[in-house]
Amino acid sequence: MLLCVSCLSVNGEMNPLGPTPSVHRSVSFWLLRLSVFLLLSLRDSKGKAIWTAHLNITFQVGNRIISELGESGVFGNHSPLERVSGAVVLPEGWNQNACSPLTNFSRPDQTDTWLALIERGGCTFTHKINLAAEKGANGVIIYNYPGTGNKVFPMSHQGTENIVAVMIGNLKGMELLHLIQQGVYVTIIIEVGRMHMPWLSHYVMSLFTFLAATVTYLFLYCAWRPRVSNSSTRRQRQLKADVKKAIGQLQLRVLQDGDKELDPNEDSCVVCFDMYKAQDVIRILTCKHFFHKTCIDPWLLAHRTCPMCKCDILKP
């Protein structure tokens, strides 16, 4: 629709030159607005990097020592990106969310450093993490709600910047919970993993959208303009032929001595401004205005209208 509108002139006639500069400016302005919007949205999303956490889990079952290493957690938004290790300790009691201010942790005697394993929900992440820190935890591991599988996200916990806090999935958290409840001594080493930048994906998609819009416009313009040019050329040829035919049907007259048109008080030819003389050939238009044939014919080919009243010779 944008390109079709561009081929019309002010009076509704086809513009043989195709899209006008004003339309190009409007399309360029639209593309500029799109790029500014994408850049602004990119600025808003920038800086939200997500850091994964490698968890090296070690525990003993019978005579076997089992170790699991996986990128199974993410650091909280306000957590220091540091390595931390220790025995995994649960909150005392049946409720594992550590929301009560009276919550304690049963730390094994042989443990120098320990990590609190806490269930998500019931209170803010900040409350859980600060409570564990007050009880002496060196780090906090929070596992997600039941039914969420191993889905994780970077937690928001302002005011807890001095203690490492990571989130793990519910399935992994329940595995650790059951092991510890069965009396298994579990230790975990938390190490900084990789940085993921969602804004980079957003940038790529934004750039792709902008380029796609630009390429689409250029493709449509290039595919459409030759057709418009050919159509306009044919129409111009036909129009010129119609004008020539109409000119040939206009009345001609040779001025003779005594004709009133030769009176010095009469008007001169408004095209060349010369006075009419005997033997001059004049062309009389449908509006009854007349001019030198040699003057008016080129004028009509170019303008199609009477120089005085703008009467169109193609219209009855």
Swiss-Prot record:
CDD domains: PA_GRAIL_like, RING-H2_RNF128-like. SUPFAM superfamilies: PA domain, RING/U-box. GO terms for molecular function: zinc ion binding. The chain crosses the membrane at residues 173-193, 204-224. The keyword Transcription regulation does not apply. InterPro entries: PA_dom_sf (IPR046450), PA_domain (IPR003137), RING_finger_E3_ligase (IPR051834), Znf_RING (IPR001841), Znf_RING/FYVE/PHD (IPR013083). It is found in: Membrane. Its main location: membrane. Glycans are attached at N56. PANTHER family: RING FINGER PROTEIN 130, SI:CH211-59O9.10. This is RING finger protein 148. It comes from Mus musculus.
